[in-house]
């Protein structure tokens, strides 16, 4: 008989003072990942993991709640300063950035890293509402 196969693994507390916040805001969702300088993930959250479903995931408020959650997780690891990389066309870009600043982080730089095709793939058809 196999017993206690599910063992609770505690996340060890890393002492990292500065990191990079990657805010990816699509038309449907907003994901925020905080990494160290090498790109190793420290904490992450999204509008979907915060309990928003459907079209509510794409709202600025959902991005703000996700940013507050990931900020709390990152501050447990001792993080104080952030560089912010924003990508995507979504509506949660600015509100996520404002929520990170309001959580007490010192934002040293803000970069827009949205990829722009040099006439790559054919875009999807226009919506007719």
From Swiss-Prot:
HAMAP family: Ribosomal_uS11. Located on the platform of the 30S subunit, it bridges several disparate RNA helices of the 16S rRNA. Forms part of the Shine-Dalgarno cleft in the 70S ribosome. This is Small ribosomal subunit protein uS11. InterPro entries: Ribosomal_uS11, Ribosomal_uS11_bac-type, Ribosomal_uS11_sf. Belongs to the universal ribosomal protein uS11 family. GO terms for molecular function: rRNA binding; structural constituent of ribosome. Keywords: Ribonucleoprotein, Ribosomal protein, RNA-binding, rRNA-binding. It comes from Rhodopseudomonas palustris (strain ATCC BAA-98 / CGA009). May be methylated on an undetermined residue. GO terms for biological process: translation. GO terms for cellular component: ribonucleoprotein complex; ribosome. The keyword Transcription regulation does not apply. NCBIfam families: PRK05309.1, uS11_bact. Pfam families: Ribosomal_S11. Part of the 30S ribosomal subunit. Interacts with proteins S7 and S18. Binds to IF-3.
């Amino acid at each position: 008989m196999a017993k206690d196969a599910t063992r609770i693994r505690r996340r060890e507390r890393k002492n990292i003072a500065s990191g990079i916040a990657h805010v990816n805001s699509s038309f449907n969702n907003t994901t925020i990942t905080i990494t160290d300088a090498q790109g190793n993930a420290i904490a992450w959250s999204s509008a979907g993991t915060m309990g928003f479903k459907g079209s509510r995931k794409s709202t600025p408020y959902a991005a703000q709640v996700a940013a507050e959650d990931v900020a709390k997780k990152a501050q447990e690891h001792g993080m104080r300063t952030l560089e912010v990389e924003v990508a995507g066309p979504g509506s949660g870009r600015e509100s996520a950035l404002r929520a990170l600043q309001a959580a007490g982080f010192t934002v040293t730089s803000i970069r827009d890293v949205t990829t722009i095709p040099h006439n790559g793939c054919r875009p999807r058809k226009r919506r007719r509402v």
